[in-house]
């Protein structure tokens, strides 16, 4: 899945996908260890999907924490006006 598609999903959807990818990776590693896996490159593809998903989750978390930490200019102006006694 493309990274741009992942950024549009919610965190719950991403965490569900992450769990599925990790289960698939476990299965592929087990098959590889027992010499039942013919397409070994799939392990690398699933690892990359896991990395993309984790990156999308971390970016969403970072954006939400920044929005909570940094209020917008309008909010700052409103706070200054109310502290001076002026109200919109």
From Swiss-Prot:
Keywords: Ribonucleoprotein, Ribosomal protein. Residues 61-88 are annotated as: Disordered. Residues 73-88 have a biased composition (Basic and acidic residues). It comes from the Bacteria. The keyword Ribosomal protein applies. Transmembrane segments: none annotated. GO terms for biological process: translation. One of its GO terms (cellular component) is cytosolic large ribosomal subunit. GO terms for molecular function: structural constituent of ribosome. Residues 61-71 have a biased composition (Polar residues). HAMAP family: Ribosomal_uL29. Belongs to the universal ribosomal protein uL29 family. This is Large ribosomal subunit protein uL29. It comes from Metamycoplasma arthritidis (strain 158L3-1) (Mycoplasma arthritidis).
